[in-house]
């Protein structure tokens, strides 16, 4: 009876009374505050032993392999039993699936009995640790039990461990410009990402303590592994050459650069239930997708939603698959890029002009790009984000005079209403100013062959000034078509004209014709004066 009362002290509350002492006595076992709709399975690991008449309780008989401190079953013991059930080392007396109603799983136990409840497969990714339930007699000979709150902590052993937890991941990005609730950026810009977590709650004896983070950049973003930092307990970790994540003398994980991103496996027991924070950077490259599709970047957080099944996953070469006790949460951020386009034509015939070279400038008159018109007269600059820009002709097409007018264009979600078959152009950068196109000024920075915009100078001593050495014009078949907002390309509303050398610009206005008439009269007068002087001579 004392053993029965001890287990009751652990699980007995919300008493359910019965009038007789019998192996046919019943009591309701309840688990409350269940969320996520998991599958609830009860494994009977202990059953009451009664006398031959069945009217006197003697003690509990446990399944082979079960070790339980009846005066205070610990979280470690409960987890070890659950591990044994999952591996087949412990054979329960019976197994029951229990339905959930209004967040409560209810089971009518017959006779004194002890169960391990495993809650698995929650649709919201919730992790449930094993729960001990018991129907036991009190001092008055009544079969009683306790309603167990699935969100409560263990009473014995690791009392800081909750019976359930809801892991999560939150991703943020900075270094962008907000435009109609969109995060926008431009080629060469540096983006800073941060990850924060809500860790799962595992017991010490759990066999699957996976805490694994994976992030792989999309093609338009270049990941910088050297920028990866981990902060834990207010201290910055040191990531060693072999990838070990060290905080002072404590190894809390190991990281590895994989493709265009990283995999990072944390050591759960070393984290002391304190979540780490991760940050890293990426550079927008010339493969960035323009327009409403954007450039997504997804971070995945893998963990165990069944800590007593499978094993801790720590293979850095390949992120884990879901299943066998592992699930994941993810958070994505999308950054959007724009491009501006314009068309170069003959001022009279409106024929497209090839080979005109233009500079693109920001509002502070800093050169950010150099572009060349193609056979169809079009040129595109992909090095713009949301904002205003200026277009100036640097070199006229062969046989034409230079257009000295400055054209302004605004790039944003509303004005980007054109779709084009060209998403980028090829630009070659150099750190040698003597090789710069038309002796053009600096447009950014180069480090390890990666281009950074003028306002995104990277750290380190191996950073060099970047100049545009050459640009490849758009293909002749490039198309432009009117579309909806957010299509990515802003097309200058007016064509940019050029006048042939030896021709005067004509707009058809009366002022132009008057100018021509005065010029003609002056020429005739000059010829007359010349003839008179010749005769006098």
Curated annotation (Swiss-Prot):
Keyword Nucleus carried by entry: no
Entry-annotated residues carrying Pentaglycyl murein peptidoglycan amidated threonine: 507
Cellular component GO terms, alphabetical: extracellular region
Propeptide intervals in chain numbering: 508-537
Membrane topology: Peptidoglycan-anchor
Compartment(s): Secreted, Cell wall
Keywords: Cell wall, Peptidoglycan-anchor, Secreted, Signal
SUPFAM superfamilies associated with the record: Cna protein B-type domain
Signal peptide: 1-22
Motif (LPXTG sorting signal): 504-508
Residue ranges of the region described as Hydrophilic: 310-330
Further facts: More than 25 serologically different T antigens are found to be expressed independently of M protein, but certain T proteins occur only in association with specific M serotypes (i.e. T6 protein is always found on M6 streptococcal strains).
Annotated protein name in UniProt: Trypsin-resistant surface T6 protein
């Amino acid at each position: 009876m004392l053993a029965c009362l001890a287990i009751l002290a652990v699980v007995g509350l919300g008493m359910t009374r019965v009038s007789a002492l019998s192996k046919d006595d019943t009591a309701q076992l309840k688990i409350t505050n269940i969320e996520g709709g998991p599958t609830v399975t009860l494994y009977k690991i202990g059953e009451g032993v009664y006398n031959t008449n069945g009217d006197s309780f003697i003690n509990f008989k446990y399944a082979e392999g079960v070790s339980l401190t009846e005066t205070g079953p610990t979280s470690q013991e409960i987890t070890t039993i659950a591990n044994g059930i999952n591996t087949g080392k412990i054979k329960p007396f019976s197994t029951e699936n229990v339905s959930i109603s209004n967040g409560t799983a209810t089971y009518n136990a017959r006779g004194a009995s002890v169960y391990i409840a495993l809650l698995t497969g929650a649709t919201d990714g919730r992790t449930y640790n094993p729960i001990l339930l018991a129907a036991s007699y009190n001092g008055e000979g009544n079969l009683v039990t306790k309603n167990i709150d699935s969100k409560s902590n263990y009473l014995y052993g690791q009392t800081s461990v909750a019976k359930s937890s809801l892991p999560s991941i939150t991703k943020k990005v900075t270094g962008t410009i907000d435009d109609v609730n969109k995060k926008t950026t431009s080629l060469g810009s540096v983006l800073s990402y941060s990850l924060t977590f809500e860790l799962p709650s595992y017991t010490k004896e759990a066999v699957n303590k996976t805490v694994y983070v994976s992030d792989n950049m999309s093609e338009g973003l270049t990941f910088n592994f050297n920028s990866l930092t981990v902060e834990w307990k207010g201290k910055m970790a040191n990531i060693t050459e072999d990838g070990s994540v060290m905080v002072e003398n404590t190894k809390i994980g190991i990281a590895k650069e994989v493709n265009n991103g990283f995999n990072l496996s944390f050591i759960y027991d070393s984290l002391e239930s304190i979540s780490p924070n991760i940050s890293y950077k990426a550079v927008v490259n010339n493969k960035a997708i323009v327009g409403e599709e954007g450039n997504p970047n997804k971070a995945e957080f893998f963990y165990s939603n069944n800590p007593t099944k499978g094993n801790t996953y720590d293979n850095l070469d390949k992120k884990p698959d879901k299943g066998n006790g592992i699930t994941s949460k993810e958070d994505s951020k999308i950054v959007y890029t724009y491009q501006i386009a314009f068309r170069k034509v003959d001022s009279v015939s409106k024929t497209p002009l090839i080979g005109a070279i233009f500079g693109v400038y920001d509002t502070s008159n800093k050169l950010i790009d150099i572009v060349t018109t193609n056979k169809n007269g079009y040129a595109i600059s992909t090095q713009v984000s949301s904002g205003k820009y200026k277009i100036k002709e640097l070199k006229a097409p062969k046989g034409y005079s230079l257009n000295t007018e400055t054209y302004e264009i605004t790039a944003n979600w509303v004005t980007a209403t054109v779709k084009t078959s060209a998403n980028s152009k090829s630009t070659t950068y150099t750190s040698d100013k003597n090789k710069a196109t038309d002796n053009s000024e600096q447009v950014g920075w180069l480090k390890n062959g990666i281009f950074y915009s003028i306002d995104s100078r990277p750290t380190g001593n191996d950073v060099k000034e970047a100049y545009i050495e050459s640009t490849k014009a758009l293909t002749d078949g490039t198309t432009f078509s009117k579309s909806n907002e957010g299509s990515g390309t802003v097309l200058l509303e007016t064509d940019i004209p050029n006048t042939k050398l030896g021709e005067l610009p004509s707009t058809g206005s009366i002022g132009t014709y008057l100018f021509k008439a005065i010029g003609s009269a002056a020429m005739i007068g000059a010829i007359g004066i010349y003839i008179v002087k010749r005769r006098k001579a």
